[in-house]
Structures are given as structure tokens and as C-alpha cells.
């Protein structure tokens, strides 16, 4: 399989997406193994295209993957552009198409039309179902940081990507004020651990809920916190953590929700009163005027706020698996999941 494998790293069409699935240092390691790597130029990617050229990558124009030979495997992170209507290549990215998300069926139909294959990175898992490459830690870190800053009235917009050191310096100033009561739901997974780390930098010791606490949610206890960070990975519909009626509870202290999971268009949404994302230009949305007022943060590419750190960690996880793309058991599981979902979508 290695002899036939050719990787093509595409430009991300989302203007705020500065991450890379493969960083230059890891591209070099694959090239040294005899795997050709093409990288599209990208005006916003955090790693300059010259860094890829310096390690032996072939450089291509942004969006030129659509004309790439069939044997190229197209690797990205977020959504594809709307064209072409028929997808003929093997694609590796986060498709967000299997849990009833908006646009999921349309994406799968594009693969049906072109005969291509989606290797969805969310479903690149080991035999126990644990994801092998994920941005969760950095999503949690960014989501926790934004929640703290908004609670203190220090979240400015539009959001700008930053280095972790700069963000940490801003968070550290939070230690000068009285710490809010913060709750992390799903505190012990990747996202939750990242949120815990961000809050620790701000001098906040959160309440941490795991599986046991979320089997039967104590909503009164949840509403007694100032900040809620939702970091739970849900794959099947379940009773929500909060409902619209709960937001009107006269005893509610909750004033900031950071929805890191951000399953806003899915039946798996554990915060169903929120059905749309917020954005870098408008990171918060008022859910109710209160008293007290309640705002939500629901940004679906949080790790892009820390693009360098997030990319380096993700690439280190993904690179060993890219070397066996399509042939190893984790990729075979991805393929089987794709064909199962393709059949379900009709």
C-alpha cells in the first residue's frame, strides 16, 4: 500500500481555519518513507508554504485537488467547498455527516455521485473505540478560556488566533478577581481535560462531572454554577442536560455556557435550546435576558484559535496512521462506517 499512497493536503476554504492536518516536520517523515506529499498553498495556514517546500513537498495551487489524479488521497480538516458535485477521490477530514447534522446527506450523495470514499477522522478509532487523532484537548482549552474571559467581560470580538503563551498571559490576569463557580460536563475526556487546564491557568478549580454524574443530571446543581462547559462526546440521542424551561428557573445562577461539543444540528445535541453556532466575529449569543442574563458560546472550530499548538499535536497523532492509509484496521473501520452510512442515507 505504501508504494501506491500519495497524499494531497488541501487548502481549507473556511477563512478562520489556520490549522493543518500535517505539519512540515511530519510531512518530511512521510516523504522519507517514500510517500509523496503535495501541499496546496494557503493564505491563512499557520505554517508557511515555504516550510513544506523545504522538506520536499510538492506545492500546488489552492483548490487544485479537484483536478488531482484519482490515486491522490485528499487530506483536510473542515468542510469541502460546494463544488464539485461528484467526489471521486479518497478524502480524509471531519465530515460531520453521520449523526444527522445539517448537510450530511448532501455530502454523502456527492460521494455516491463520484464513487469516492470518506475516511472520517472522527471515526478513526482503535479497537476500543478511542479516537486515534483528535483536536479535543485544544478545543476544550479554547472553549474554557473563552468562557472565563466572557464571564469577566474581557472577551473581545472578532476573535483572533493566538499562541498559547499569549492566551495564558491573558487568563492569568483572571487570578486577580473572585473565581466563578464553573462546571465541566465530560471533564475527563480530551476536551474536558483541556478545559480543566485552561481554568487552572485562570486560577479556577471547576466542578468536574463524568459519566456517573451525567447519567441522571442534577439540574439544580448545574444551574447553581456561573459557567457551564459542555465537553461531552455523544454518539446516540440522550436526555438533554438542560431544556428551554430550565433556563427560566428563578434560582438559576448560570450566565455563560461554552458548548465545546457543538452538536447544534444533530439529534445528539445535549443543549437543544441552542440550534446554531456562533462565530469568530460574534462569539456569543444571548439565550435569555434573565435576570441574570445567559449567553452561549458555540464555535465549531475552537482549536483554530490555537492553530500552531493544535496542529502540531494532531499531526503527531495522525502521521503514523497516514503511512498506512486505507490498509490498516482503523482505516478499514472508517471505510466500513462510511459504506454503512452511505446505505442508510440512500
Q: What residues fall within each predicted segment?
A:
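Rossmann-like adenosine-cofactor binding region
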Residues: 211-290
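Glycine-rich phosphate/diphosphate-binding loop of Rossmann-like nucleotide-binding domains
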Residues: 11-42, 47, 156-233
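General beta-strand structural signal in soluble alpha/beta enzymes
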Residues: 9, 38-41, 60-61, 75-76, ...
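An N-terminal-biased, well-structured beta-alpha scaffold segment characteristic
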Residues: 3-110
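Short glycine-/small-residue-rich Rossmann-like dinucleotide-binding loops
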Residues: 78-79, 95-96, 232-237, 261-262, ...
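Adenosine-phosphate binding glycine-rich loop
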Residues: 117, 122-170, 262-346
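Phosphate-coordination loops involved in phosphoryl transfer and adenosine-cofactor binding
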Residues: 4, 88, 178-181, 254
Amino acid at each position: 500500500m505504501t508504494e501506491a499512497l500519495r497524499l494531497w493536503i488541501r487548502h481549507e476554504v473556511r477563512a478562520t481555519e489556520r490549522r493543518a492536518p500535517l505539519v512540515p516536520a511530519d510531512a518530511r517523515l512521510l516523504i522519507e518513507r517514500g510517500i509523496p506529499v503535495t501541499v496546496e498553498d494557503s493564505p491563512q495556514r499557520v505554517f508557511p508554504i515555504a516550510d513544506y517546500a523545504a522538506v520536499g513537498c510538492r506545492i500546488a495551487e489552492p483548490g487544485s485537488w479537484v483536478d488531482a489524479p484519482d490515486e491522490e488521497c485528499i487530506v483536510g480538516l473542515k468542510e469541502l467547498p460546494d463544488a464539485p458535485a461528484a467526489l471521486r477521490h479518497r478524502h480524509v477530514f471531519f465530515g460531520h455527516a453521520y449523526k444527522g447534522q445539517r448537510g450530511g446527506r448532501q455530502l454523502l450523495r456527492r460521494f455516491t455521485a463520484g464513487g469516492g470514499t470518506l475516511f472520517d477522522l472522527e471515526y478513526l478509532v482503535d479497537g476500543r473505540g478511542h479516537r486515534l487523532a483528535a483536536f479535543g484537548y485544544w478545543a476544550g482549552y479554547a472553549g474554557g478560556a473563552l468562557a472565563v474571559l466572557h464571564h469577566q467581560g474581557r472577551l473581545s470580538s472578532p476573535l483572533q488566533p493566538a499562541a498559547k503563551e499569549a492566551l495564558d498571559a491573558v487568563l492569568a490576569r483572571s487570578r486577580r478577581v473572585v473565581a466563578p463557580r464553573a462546571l465541566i460536563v465530560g471533564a475527563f475526556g480530551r476536551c474536558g481535560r483541556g478545559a480543566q487546564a485552561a481554568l487552572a491557568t485562570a486560577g479556577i478549580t471547576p466542578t468536574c462531572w463524568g459519566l456517573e454524574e451525567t447519567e441522571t443530571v442534577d439540574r439544580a446543581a448545574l444551574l447553581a454554577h456561573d459557567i457551564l462547559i459542555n465537553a461531552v462526546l455523544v454518539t446516540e440521542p440522550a436526555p438533554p442536560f438542560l431544556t428551554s424551561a430550565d433556563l427560566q428557573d428563578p434560582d438559576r445562577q448560570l450566565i455563560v455556557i461554552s458548548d465545546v461539543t457543538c452538536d447544534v444540528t444533530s439529534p445528539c445535541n445535549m443543549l437543544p435550546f441552542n440550534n446554531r453556532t456562533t462565530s469568530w466575529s460574534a462569539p456569543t449569543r444571548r439565550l435569555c435576558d434573565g435576570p441574570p442574563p445567559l449567553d452561549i458560546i458555540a464555535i465549531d472550530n475552537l482549536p483554530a484559535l490555537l492553530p500552531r499548538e493544535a496542529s502540531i499535536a494532531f499531526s503527531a497523532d495522525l502521521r503514523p496512521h497516514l503511512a498506512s492509509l486505507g490498509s490498516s484496521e482503523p482505516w478499514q473501520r472508517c471505510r466500513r462506517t462510511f459504506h454503512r452510512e452511505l446505505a442508510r442515507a440512500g
